[in-house]
């Protein structure tokens, strides 16, 4: 909903540079593709909404799995082709962690891979290297079986292997302490899945 809101309305925002509007629109197309990817993997076909609607108007019929993949690829291709979306942010840049062409190539390649189109997936993954991304290597050149652990330390959260990563915030008191109640036990952080939707409640959303 929020991604569609930005995509459809950001052009009407006054006193904002057109290049910034284009970049933000591309970022939101990535996020819309991200959401529809996970919906399509789970349900193999869902209603496609490219505009904001009220809950009472959410009555579209279910689109096919192939149609959803097509929309996902279209959004990611728009990201890649957007000249105002950078390929990669430099370390220390205040925008590091935002969506880039590198993230769009990676996610489109990931999508092609899931679809079984390995040639296109490989082409996208190879394009990432051309943008300056590379596998993590310790700066001191010492190799060991614990190198991989260093990749996830705050000091390396902006290394060249990071394509799309949430940036560490060391300040305490951020976030929501109840979030752990909702996740599945197999998710990172060992969530508790204390709250589960009632099947009858879920069925209320099958409108078409």
Residue ranges and their predicted role:
Residues 43, 55, 130:
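Residue-level signal for pocket-adjacent positions within structured domains
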Residues 50-57, 92-93:
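Short linear capping/connector segments at secondary-structure termini
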Residues 36-38, 45, 94-102:
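Aromatic-lined, polymer-binding surfaces characteristic
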Residues 46-51, 138-141:
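Short, charged hinge/linker segments at domain and secondary-structure junctions
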């Amino acid at each position: 909903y929020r991604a569609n809101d930005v995509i459809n309305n950001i052009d009407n925002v006054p006193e904002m540079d057109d290049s910034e509007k284009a970049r933000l629109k591309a970022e939101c197309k990535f996020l819309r593709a991200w959401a529809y990817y996970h919906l399509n993997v789970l349900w193999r076909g869902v209603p496609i909404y490219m505009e904001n609607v009220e809950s009472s108007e959410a009555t579209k019929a279910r689109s096919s799995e192939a149609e959803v993949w097509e929309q996902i690829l279209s959004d990611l291709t728009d990201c890649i082709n957007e000249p105002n979306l950078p390929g990669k942010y430099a370390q220390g840049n205040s925008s590091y962690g935002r969506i880039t062409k590198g993230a769009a190539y990676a996610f489109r390649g990931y999508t092609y891979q899931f679809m079984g189109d390995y040639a296109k997936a490989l082409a996208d993954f190879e394009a990432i290297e051309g943008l300056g991304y590379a596998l993590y290597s310790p700066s001191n050149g010492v190799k060991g079986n614990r190198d991989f652990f260093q990749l996830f330390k705050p000091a390396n959260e902006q290394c060249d292997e990071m394509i799309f990563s949430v940036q560490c915030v060391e300040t305490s008191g951020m976030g929501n302490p109840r979030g752990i109640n909702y996740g599945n036990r197999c998710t990172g952080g060992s969530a508790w899945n204390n709250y589960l939707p009632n099947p009858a409640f879920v069925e209320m959303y099958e409108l078409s």
